[in-house]
Amino acid sequence: MLPLLKSLRPRQWSKNVVIFAGLAFSGAATDQGLLVSALTAFAAFCLASSAVYIVNDIFDRERDRLHPIKRHRPIASGTMSVKAGILFAIILVAASLFLSSLVGTAVWAIGGYLVLQALYTPWLKHVVLLDVFSIAAGFSLRVLGGAWAIEAPLSPWLVACTVQLALFLALCKRRAEAANLSPEQLSGDTTTGQRPILAEYAGQGTDMMVGIMAAATLVTFTLYTLLPASVLSAGIPDLESRAGEPGMVFTLPFVFYGVLRYLHLVYSKGEGERPERIATMDPPMIIAGLGFVAVAGGVIYF
């Protein structure tokens, strides 16, 4: 049972929290029925993502056995067989599709996510830039799935913020991974368990891309908080009463601090390989996140 639980990677489920963005920003988080629908979508994405992790471990088992950390994963270490992994992945996918079918059109987001991952695992993650864009697309599908589950309109600006933030985090992750590569790995040595594609992110170009996405994220979110509702709604009438809340400008200090703190951790502390760890273990980031939630919640719901 323990190998299965480790293969599910429950710590990674924190990435699925963005599913609640549509519910939170629509001002409907106090609606019990909609909250249940959003939680159902969250559970469905957790099951789907765990299935993807198992399949990914099956594909990468030979390379993982050469990696100092990944060699301890159940499939790479042999504590869980490939056949068992395939069986569990099928069960998880079936359960995920069943749950998502209970909440409107969220099943299409789950389906799209699974198709994306079916391309990502064997191919896209080995192609420079397409790998990080695939990660961003996965987060976008999570946000869309959460909104479709509660049948709520979703601001294009919020989707844009999600995509840009996901690209920023993915590029920071690749930059951190590349910074920890040895000279042999940078030269293309595949006997160390690292993917050769990581060497492509070792140059200054990655630093420039990180800076661009950090700036784009901050500018887009700033506009989201400052522009009038009629502009933010992008022609969607149902969004006009939910966007452009004047008080949202007070969330900007927390957002700016969070992005700058993250950059500091990546460039000064050599972190960034595990974004979920930074979000849940770094005290300043936790405080910034709680501050954002408190201010945004107060503006939207009071």
Task: Report the location of each language-model feature.
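Multi-pass membrane catalytic core of lipid/isoprenoid biosynthesis enzymes
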Residues: 61, 66-111, 156-167, 207-219, ...
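Generic alpha-helical transmembrane segments of integral inner-membrane proteins
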Residues: 17-21, 39, 43-50, 87-98, ...
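Acidic (Asp/Glu-rich) catalytic motifs at the cytosolic membrane interface
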Residues: 48-76, 124, 130, 172-179, ...
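Hydrophobic alpha-helical transmembrane segments
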Residues: 24-28, 95-102, 120-123, 145-150, ...
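Topogenic membrane-insertion module of multi-pass membrane proteins
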Residues: 1-65, 78-91
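Short, amphipathic, aromatic/basic-enriched membrane-interface segments that mark the entry/exit
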Residues: 4-11, 73-85, 101-106, 124-132, ...
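C-terminal membrane-associated helical module and adjoining short loops/tails
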Residues: 2-5, 122, 140-302
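Short, aromatic-rich membrane-interface segments at the entry and exit
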Residues: 33-37, 105-110, 128-132, 153-159
